[in-house]
Amino acid sequence: MYEYFEGTITVVNPAYVVIEVAGIGYRILTPTPYAYKEGDKARIYVEQVVRENGMTLYGFKSQQDKVLFNKLNEVSGIGPKSALAIMAAEDNGALASAIESGEVSYLTRFPGIGKKTASQIVLDLRGKMGNYVAENLFTEDEPVESVFPALEDALLALGALGYSQKEVDRIKPKLKKLPEMSADEYIKQGLGFLLKK
């Protein structure tokens, strides 16, 4: 069983990345492929799912994201692909908070999640997200190598424009999902997100 891969990102695709470790390329499905950049060194925490038709690797930027994926995957009616789609749609801190507070309507916003499945998620996982919410484990505090330098500059600039750290942290996961761009473009996108309150 693999715990994580550490190597060089060689392919970034809308659905997956390829990480090369000791001359072998591993294709890993991830909710945030554009958080990685070709040529970057990275550590990806992986979950191996074996089915009759083969083996699939699912990868995450942190151990906590991997734990959340496994919890979602254990819910009746949620498979690995649905769990991945849920984690790609919003930041995981907000997701954990919604589960803890029983916000079924929030959960139905995710692809393929109806009211029945959303209720099942709350039923199965409510009371198990407290540590994630309380300790704020999903703040995307990952190594700098996984974040575009221009994005870091843009986040600092937004803070200098008068936005609070909380506001900047709220939009950071959304900006990280975008393809790499200039700091000016990140600032424009960030302002757009901030004004959509």
Curated annotation (Swiss-Prot):
Sequence segments annotated as region (Domain II): 62-140
Q: Does the keyword Ligase apply?
A: no
> Per its UniProt record, what InterPro entries does this chain match?
DNA_helicase_Holl-junc_RuvA_I, Hlx-hairpin-Hlx_DNA-bd_motif, NA-bd_OB-fold, RuvA, RuvA_2-like, RuvA_C, RuvA_C_sf
Q: Which GO terms describe its cellular component?
A: cytoplasm; Holliday junction helicase complex; Holliday junction resolvase complex
Q: How does it assemble?
A: Homotetramer. Forms an RuvA(8)-RuvB(12)-Holliday junction (HJ) complex. HJ DNA is sandwiched between 2 RuvA tetramers; dsDNA enters through RuvA and exits via RuvB. An RuvB hexamer assembles on each DNA strand where it exits the tetramer. Each RuvB hexamer is contacted by two RuvA subunits (via domain III) on 2 adjacent RuvB subunits; this complex drives branch migration. In the full resolvosome a probable DNA-RuvA(4)-RuvB(12)-RuvC(2) complex forms which resolves the HJ.
Q: What CDD domains does the record tag this protein with?
A: UBA_RuvA_C
Q: Where is this region: Domain I?
A: 1-61
Name the source's superkingdom. Answer: Bacteria
Its job: The RuvA-RuvB-RuvC complex processes Holliday junction (HJ) DNA during genetic recombination and DNA repair, while the RuvA-RuvB complex plays an important role in the rescue of blocked DNA replication forks via replication fork reversal (RFR). RuvA specifically binds to HJ cruciform DNA, conferring on it an open structure. The RuvB hexamer acts as an ATP-dependent pump, pulling dsDNA into and through the RuvAB complex. HJ branch migration allows RuvC to scan DNA until it finds its consensus sequence, where it cleaves and resolves the cruciform DNA.
Which residue stretches belong to region Domain III? 150-197
SUPFAM superfamilies named among the record's database cross-references: DNA helicase RuvA subunit, C-terminal domain (SSF46929), Nucleic acid-binding proteins (SSF50249), RuvA domain 2-like (SSF47781)
List this protein's GO terms for biological process: DNA recombination; DNA repair
Keyword vocabulary terms for this entry: Cytoplasm, DNA damage, DNA recombination, DNA repair, DNA-binding
Q: What gene codes for this chain?
A: ruvA
Which GO molecular function annotation, any one, does this entry have?
A: ATP binding
- Renumbered to this chain, region (Flexible linker) spans 141-150
Q: What species is this protein from?
A: Lactobacillus delbrueckii subsp. bulgaricus (strain ATCC BAA-365 / Lb-18)
Subcellular locations according to the entry: Cytoplasm
**Annotated protein name in UniProt:** Holliday junction branch migration complex subunit RuvA
Its UniProt domain note says: Has three domains with a flexible linker between the domains II and III and assumes an 'L' shape. Domain III is highly mobile and contacts RuvB.
Q: Which family does it belong to?
A: Belongs to the RuvA family.
